[in-house]
Amino acid sequence: MDLGRRITRDAEHRYIGSGLMIRALLSALLFLTSGLAAQAANDIAQIQQGLDSPVIVDVRSEGEYASGAIDGALNHPLQGLPGTLIDMGVELDEEVIVYCRSGRRSAQAKTLLKQAGFQLVFDGGPMTQLEQVLEQSEP
């Protein structure tokens, strides 16, 4: 089947032509991202309440980390997780806060670490947001 013919035929299809498929996909995307945003907000609230002695992990690239990072943060790019934290001796029951530039990689990092058995992982989201939260929660 020729791709051009299939697209033409699909374009004439009632559901695609009327935009119902696109609307359904957008609705599903909004639903999924709102769930992630709610999880991140919950994590931020827990960070604000104060954690004992969390390991703060910057999951950005080495170059991004070199351009500036949160004081005391360790650089473990997303591609190396969870292995680099395990190799460093971070225990599965330690509090770990992950952050990045925009919040996308930190959400992925949280998922990877949870799947590896880390129990107390918090998504700090974007670096600028986490900096503000940490400053506000300092005594």
PLM region spans:
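Sec-dependent N-terminal signal peptides
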Residues: 25-33
